[in-house]
Curated annotation (Swiss-Prot):
Keyword Cell membrane: no
InterPro entries registered for this protein in UniProt: Ribosomal_mS23_fun
Subunit comment: Component of the mitochondrial small ribosomal subunit.
Keywords: Mitochondrion, Ribonucleoprotein, Ribosomal protein
Name of the featured protein: Small ribosomal subunit protein mS23
Organism: Aspergillus oryzae (strain ATCC 42149 / RIB 40)
One Pfam family it belongs to: MRP-S25
A molecular-function term among this protein's GO annotations: structural constituent of ribosome
Length: 261
């Protein structure tokens, strides 16, 4: 068919004919799958549909006695794409992505905390009630702040993004402080009953830093000596005066001293 190559569409027919002709002794296992789900016959590739970001808000409308749920559509700016990127899959975006980016930009060290990503059924989120920040069976982390902020935006009337962020962040700080106090009290009680603890993470880090600094000092001294030797090789060693020259200089100095007197 001219410039179109339909060999890939006829791959099942080709495999069956090769089996009938005796070129192959076994039918491929994907024969039935290709029969049930044949390749697409459309030769024109359509451009991917650009989806809009829809946000749910609870607002008090003029003339209404109660707040009503309003769905806001955020218009996406259409950017011209190159021909090579025209048919790439559409990027999936959620409202939580912007909230998550803002929180971890302000609290980068929260990413260094260990996290448990294992789920039992994959539907653990159904058991969470984000009307409060702390959830049973889930450790407090940055994702808790993001979900709490999103709940405030969706369920509190006339809630703004900055106000919801401040409320969730204030609750997060209070719970973090409570965890630190509980950890310190538990350590003090254990030490009072005779428990001994090893060095803290800060002390271990300082010790590793000191060891690395000592290794660097040894390396720096050796590098400095090598550079000095290379410089001496280019310039040559300084000349050492002979014994006769040194004696002549000393006699000249002794002769000049009486004249000055």
């Amino acid at each position: 068919m001219g410039k179109y190559n339909l060999t890939a569409l006829r791959v099942r027919q080709t495999a069956l004919r090769q089996k009938e002709a005796g070129k192959t002794h076994q039918i491929p296992k994907w024969i039935d799958v290709v029969r049930d789900i044949p390749p697409a016959q459309v030769l024109v590739r359509n451009q991917q549909q650009q989806h809009q970001l829809v946000r749910q808000r609870l607002k008090t409308l003029p003339g209404a006695s109660k707040p009503q749920v309003v769905f806001e559509v955020q218009e996406k700016r259409v950017k011209p794409k190159k021909a090579s990127r025209m048919f790439l899959p559409t990027e999936i975006k959620y409202e939580e992505d912007l909230l998550r980016k803002e929180f971890f930009r302000d609290h980068p060290w929260e990413l260094a905390r260990p996290r448990v990503v294992l789920e039992s059924t994959g539907k653990d989120y159904e058991n969470y009630d984000w009307s409060r920040l702390q959830q049973p069976g889930k450790r407090l982390d940055g994702e808790s702040v993001v979900q709490r902020q999103l709940w405030l935006l969706n369920n509190v009337p006339d809630m703004t993004k900055s106000t919801a962020y401040d409320i969730a962040r204030r609750e997060f700080y209070r719970l973090r402080l409570q965890e630190d106090i509980e950890r310190r009290v538990a350590a003090e009680e254990a030490e009072a009953t005779g428990a001994t603890f090893g060095p803290t993470r800060l002390e271990i880090g300082m010790e590793l830093e000191n060891q690395e600094y000592e290794r660097w000092k040894v390396w720096a001294k050796s590098e400095a000596q090598v550079q000095e030797q290379r410089a001496a090789a280019f310039t040559g060693a300084p000349e050492i005066p002979s014994t006769e020259d040194s004696l002549g200089l000393e006699e000249g100095v002794e002769e000049k001293q009486p004249q000055q007197a």
